[in-house]
Amino acid sequence: MTLACVLAVCAAALQSGPTFGQSRTASTNFRDPDAKPYDAQLFQLSEILGTVHYLRELCGADEGQMWRGKMRQLVGSEGTSALRRARLVDSFNKGYRGYAQTYRTCTRPALQAINRFMIQGARLADTLIENNR
């Protein structure tokens, strides 16, 4: 599956999911020979997917592993090296774990965060699609 297809699927899922509620940029300390000019945005999207996966599950969205599945598609499309796959997964886990430390129950701020991340993730995916046609 091409990057554009994977990003389109992520964008559609982020836009169509029922909303409830800024992300840190992934670290770029590693030298990856497969690095792409859009990596900062891609790793940010990965982190958002992890955050959304955790928060929506916490708030009872009953989506199972949908967001993890979207991440698997992204890794399958963009994980062209072991280092790159590890960085993508690390970004997803960073989003998941970061919000797992902050939110233990579904609260109004958690719902607001979901809304923000759904919007931010959809915009980011759309931007990645547009810039990489």
Question: What is each of the regions a protein language model found here?
Answer:
Residues M1-V6:
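Bacterial N-terminal signal peptides that target proteins for export
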Residues A8-V9, T19:
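Cleavable N-terminal signal peptides
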Residues E63-R133:
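Compact alpha-helical subdomains of small soluble proteins
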